[in-house]
Amino acid sequence: MQIADLITILGNPLTVMTLLPILGAMLLMLAHWMANAEMRVTLEKPIRAVNLTLALLMFILATLIGLEETFGLAWGEYLYQNCQVGEIGTGSCALIGSIGVSWHVGIDALSYPMVWLTTLLIPITMVVEWDAKKGAYFHSLILMMEGALIGVFVSLDLFVFYVFWELTLIPMFFLILMWGGEDRRYAAQKFFIYTFAASVFMLAGILVMYFNNDASWIGNITGKSFDFVLMDTQTNFIASEGLRSVVFLLMLIGFATKLPSVPVHTWLPDAHVQAPTAGSMLLAGVMLKMGAYGFLRLGVTLFPDQVIEFQTLLLILGMVSLVYGAVVCLGQLNLKRMVAYSSVSHMGLIFLGIATLEPLGIAGAIFMMFAHGIISPLLFAVCGSFKHHYHTLEIDSMRGLAKHSPWMSGHMMVGWMGSLGLPLMAGFVAEVAVLIAFYMAFGWWVLLPAVTLIVTAAYYLWSMQRTIFEGGRDDHDHPIAKLPSTLHGESPRDITWHENTGMLILGVLAVVYGIYPDFFGMFEMMSDWASLLVEYRLYPAEVGP
């Protein structure tokens, strides 16, 4: 690597967004660790403030990147036409040149919504947990996770992609282990084992791709490269159709576990229930989307023939996840566990959208990733405040919440309505897009997912009625709220200003994207990406001269 190359790469905005949060978090944790006991107490608030400042700077930079006039980004000219993933942010230099590992980052209409969502959620989670007595390391781990997540979404070298993929496990593991619930050790270990084991399948697929691509012109000792763009420009770079199918299935296992999809979903409810509020918000908001993003980026883009071949398998996985998640939700008494299983159901809808092989369905799946990344963190923030103020997550233990906590009740209603797909909410746009595409592809079979979505509405409305509105009666037959015994004589309270701030932002965005899905150009760029994917990858033979 030349010094000039290093300077160029470090000046790249995507490199800054990836490395600065990681390095900043490590330095802040090191400073706290090296301080004496008295100084550590003094440093906690400044370190927390620096973490939030860095997170806000990353959000500002991500927003500027999204403004076409700022960097001259043309969403329609990427990947398939120019063999590049975006005009802004692409830059590479050799890291381990002898084996074809390079620092190659880029952004396009698939990765940008995920990058922007990540930079949005990180400061919100910090604000929601602003007064949490969890020490200086807590917010630094959240900041470190931001860099790792952005690294996953912008890395175009698959070796570096895998490194960042695994790096995301470390902060989340410690967030659950150190600040989780009573069974946090079990949940943290289960989360790590499941996701790490799944990533081994993905790594095996990456290595097969590495040894089957031709990069002899680079002149390294292997004549191979981990570069995604290079692989993408080589049609069927894996000669054997059978081997391509094997690699596709390896990728599917790895990404479906992360999504997660039934039957490899069992780590998720335990992780959500035991994780702290910030951990659940990031897990549902962004980490689950890594699975869908990776499948679209590597599985669908590089192996289009196999997507068509295994279309039925994708349909089964999506439909089973959608139905199973919805039905299991009906029997849940724990608020967090119910929201966790609803995530499994929504992730099934993403698979169904991809399985339609229609531009609208794929765009709807991507928008579902984005919409769920706003709505689900809102619900987990509500769960966290419910636990914080009422010391319980049991739905049956609380009735008439609106009487004592009107702000919490309002945010809970917005989250539930968005999740069940109420019109004028972001989730509705994604669901309608997927269902229309499903009808275009499979006709009246669309009734199966449509009926399941009605079940989704049922369990949310049922829980909302019991928790927010339904109460008991006093000795004089007057309606009263039923307070949980876990209050131990404490007075019920509404949410704090910082909790309210984070929830308001998410709730407003859920409504804004429901009314105008193309706000900040989001749905348009998703549709462009999906259209080009279908036109140039899935059905290239149908493209005219």
Regions picked out by a protein language model, each given a short descriptive name:
Residues 42-56, 186-198, 405-409, 496-506:
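Alpha-helical transmembrane segments and their helix-start/interface "positive-inside/aromatic belt" motifs
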Residues 51-60, 120, 143-144, 249-251, ...:
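Alpha-helical transmembrane segments
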Residues 53-70, 195-207, 505-519:
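Hydrophobic alpha-helical membrane-insertion segments
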Residues 55-68, 145, 289-291, 416-420:
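A generic, lipid-embedded transmembrane alpha helix
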Residues 124-131, 147-159, 173-471:
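Hydrophobic transmembrane alpha-helices and their helix-loop junctions in integral membrane proteins
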Residues 215, 405-407, 461-545:
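Cytoplasmic/organellar membrane-interface segments at the starts of transmembrane helices
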